[in-house]
């Protein structure tokens, strides 16, 4: 499992640990990743993803997983998240066609 957020593609960064005597040592800054289960309103089921806490805040801001995925770019999403996005788009399209008929 990679240390990368499945929604925002946030990953590890490299920087320096600086001591009191100003000696710089390479270190990695890892993202704060959590395993969380989202509920998709469109799909009517639970979706388990590994996301950063920053992405979790963004999902809440956009009104849930469905709203976040529909506005997100495919390049930033993991293959699993892109698949979920396609399922949501398909479900919404069929719901709109059923409402018109």
UniProtKB/Swiss-Prot annotation:
One of its GO terms (biological process) is translation. GO terms for molecular function: structural constituent of ribosome. SUPFAM superfamilies: L28p-like. One of its GO terms (cellular component) is cytosolic large ribosomal subunit. Keywords: Ribonucleoprotein, Ribosomal protein. It comes from the Bacteria. InterPro entries: Ribosomal_bL28, Ribosomal_bL28/bL31-like_sf, Ribosomal_bL28_bact-type, Ribosomal_bL28_sf. Signal peptide: none annotated. It holds the Pfam family Ribosomal_L28. Belongs to the bacterial ribosomal protein bL28 family. PANTHER family: 39S RIBOSOMAL PROTEIN L28, MITOCHONDRIAL (PTHR13528), LARGE RIBOSOMAL SUBUNIT PROTEIN BL28M (PTHR13528:SF2). HAMAP family: Ribosomal_bL28. This is Large ribosomal subunit protein bL28. It comes from Rhodopseudomonas palustris (strain BisA53). The gene is rpmB.
């Amino acid at each position: 499992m990679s240390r990368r957020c499945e929604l925002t593609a946030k990953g590890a960064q490299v920087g320096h640990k600086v001591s009191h005597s100003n000696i710089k040592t390479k270190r990695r800054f890892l993202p704060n990743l959590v395993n969380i289960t989202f509920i998709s309103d469109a799909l009517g089921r639970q979706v388990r993803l590994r996301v950063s806490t920053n992405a979790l805040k963004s999902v809440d801001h956009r009104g849930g997983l469905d709203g976040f995925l529909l506005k997100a770019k495919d390049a930033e999403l993991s293959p699993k998240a892109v698949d979920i996005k396609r399922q949501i788009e398909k479900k919404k399209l069929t719901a709109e066609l059923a409402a018109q008929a």
